[in-house]
Amino acid sequence: MSEIFSPAQRYELWLRIELIVTEGWAEIGEIPRPAVERLKRARVDAEHIARLEERVGHDVVAFLDSLAESLGDDARFLHRGLTSSDVLDTALALQLVQAADILLNDVDRLSAVVRRRAIEERATLMAGRTHGIHAEPVSFGFILAGWLDELDRERQRIVTAREDVRVGKLSGAVGTHATVDPRVEEMALAKLGLRVAPVTTQVIARDHHAAYLTTLAVVGGSLEKFATDIRHLQRTEVAEVREPFGQEQKGSSAMPHKRNPILSERICGLARTVRGYAQVALEDQALWHERDISHSSAERIIFPDACTLLDYMLRLMADIIEGLTIDRERMRANLYRSGGVVFSQRVLLALVQKGMSRQDAYRVVQSAALTALDDGQDFRTIVGEAPEVRERLTTEELAELFDPAYYLRHLDVTFERVGLEPVALAPSPARGAAQGGGS
């Protein structure tokens, strides 16, 4: 990713654009074909261009001056009818397309890891939590299936952003083609693999770029969501999962026992940075008239940084999930830590099915559940002693309501919907043994 946005690569793209434009001029008979062939001998010298830029204060002028020193009279055919932004914006489009391709590969790798772990943990029971409070049983594989579904959407968003930003312009100083034949633009951009922006000013409208960076921010938000879940599940009081932690790694300069979720925390911090860059891109939409240069300085930072950061975040998240320790015994123990109140809705629905009004059934079940929570008692015992329950449910019927497998009975459907094999997989004994015991 860093190579895409390196000065040397940027100059190579500029040269490629300039040469392809001369080919377009030659096609319509405006430039001698032999001169075009001689121009192809041009080579960029990034260090020399940088020195020239310090003197002239303009990057494209420095680039052209550097080429002119070695090309002689043929250099006059370069940049014919173009303005700097023709080269800059077209090159930026190529860079962002290349960056999107890398990000798509990153998403594919992460999705493959999540897919495999979801299948492995399909039947790993744990407490589902809403508002941070125990709700109903889920499986860790179910949670990972949700992540996979989200990654599928993020992939499509990147594909859409890539196509949206895949536009170039070679239309001159204010976009009117006064000095560039539209045929040259069409031929050149076709060779570059870019679409022609139908209407431009001196620049391509920045809604394309704002949408691109906003997409990166949304993808980063998904990674932050995954990382936040991991951080919560690694808390000492929960201890259901654990990030990879090296044998010689240290968690604190003061406390030797510390094993902190720093990788997930890092992703959360970097997601905020990418969101900040998206805000800058949104601000860059409102340029003066046919163009000002207020966007330029910001874009030199936000595009390389945001693309590089998201590339790193996607790779890091894949490594985290690949090496994530899952404590299945702790997950099951935590599920029952709240005294079995996670089964309260099943009791409620069973009573309603037996003829109680929903309001009365809710009152009975809630009273038993809150007593169990407040006094640290077993919910099934307390609710089973309620007269309204004894009158309607046998001991066997009540026991069936506390079967956690009930909550996973439609998991095959969920897995099929995200393209996962609907096969009931028991947790791997080898993996479970290696990963047993929370921190």
Model-assigned labels for residue ranges:
Residues M1-L13, I17, E37, R41, ...:
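Glycine-rich cofactor/substrate-binding loops
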Residues M1-S171, H177, D181-M187, V196, ...:
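A helix-coil-helix interface module used to build multimeric assemblies
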Residues V97-D108, R115, A145-L148, D152, ...:
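Short amphipathic alpha-helical segments with heptad-repeat character
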Residues I31, V238-A239, S357, A434:
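Conserved hydrophobic residue
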Residues E185-A278:
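Acidic, glycine-rich loop-and-beta core segments that form the ion-binding/anion-interacting portion
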Residues S84, T176, L189, V196-V203, ...:
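A structural signal for small-residue-enriched, beta-sheet-centric alpha/beta enzyme cores
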Residues G24, S66, S70, V113, ...:
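Generic, well-ordered alpha-helical scaffold segments in large soluble proteins
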Residues F142, A210-V218, R346-K354:
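Short, well-ordered beta-strand elements within core beta-sheets of diverse protein domains
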